[in-house]
Amino acid sequence: KRGEQPVTNKRANINKNILRVQKLHARLANIRLAYVKSIVNDVVKTKPTFITVEDLNVKGMMKNKHLSKAVAQQCFYAFKTWLSTKCREYGIELRQVDRFYPSSKICSCCGQKKSDLKLSDRVYTCECGNVMDRDLNASINLLQAKKYTILT
C-alpha cells in the first residue's frame, strides 16, 4: 500500500549496536593490557637487582566517585601479577612496601618528613633546599626503603 513504511526489526539494530559497543570495550581492554605488558617488559629488560612497589589501597580509591572509573581502568592487579611473573622469570627481587609508608612525604636527601603535603602539590620542596618532582622523590624513597616484604 502507498504511504506505509516498511516494517523493520528494531531489535536487530539495537543488538548490532550493543555488539559494536561491546567490541569497542574489549578493544580498549586489550589496548590497556598490551600497554601494561609493554611497560613491565621495558622495566624488566633493564635488569635491575630489585623492583619496589607500593601496596595501594585500590578498594579505598574505588570509593571516591570522581576517581573510581579512572582507577578501575588502570589495571593495577594485571600490572602487579604481570610484574611478579616477569620478575620470577628473570630472577629479579620484587619488593612491596606497606601502603602507609610515606614515600612522597619524606625528603629523599635529608630524610625529613613533610606532613602538610597535599595531593595537588606536584613539586616537593624541602627546607634543606631539595626541590624536585613529587613522583621522582617518591621513587627515590621507594628505592631506599628499609621495611618491605619480598613477593618473589
Where are these regions (language model features)?
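Positively charged, helix-rich recognition surfaces that bind polyanionic ligands
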Residues: 1-152
